[in-house]
């Protein structure tokens, strides 16, 4: 069962994404910001199959988190989420380390498809 770390500062979004992903049998762990997510990753030795993170968060944003994860856990797939066009542009410069950027608002089907695609790419 794939383990997925979800980082988002909005409780309702973390809950929605975790429930959607759990529908496919994935184990989810959540963090309120990038710093907490990085701490979890480090403590667990990167033992996750996918990081799904919002870009705009306090303490450590998703871009900084993605850069740290790419450095420390280069095999971990990363999906970014954003509701802002300018952040999507910022993320486009990270194509080498980010699998995809999911635009908010999204449907449950959209996020499940994005996660399935990222996990399939990890196995390829």
Predicted regions, residues:
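Conserved sequence signature across two-component system core domains
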Residues: 7-8, 31, 51
């Amino acid at each position: 069962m794939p383990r997925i770390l979800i980082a988002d500062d909005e409780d309702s979004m973390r809950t929605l994404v975790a429930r959607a992903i759990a529908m496919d049998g994935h184990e989810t762990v959540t963090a309120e910001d990038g710093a907490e997510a990085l701490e979890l990753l480090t403590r667990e030795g990167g033992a996750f199959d996918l990081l799904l993170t919002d870009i705009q968060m306090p303490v450590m944003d998703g871009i900084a988190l993605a850069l740290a994860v790419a450095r420390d856990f280069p095999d971990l797939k990363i999906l970014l989420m954003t509701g802002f066009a300018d952040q999507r542009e910022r993320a486009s410069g990270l194509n080498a380390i980010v699998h995809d950027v999911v635009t908010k608002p999204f449907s449950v089907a959209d996020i499940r498809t994005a996660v399935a695609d990222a996990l399939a790419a990890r196995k390829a």
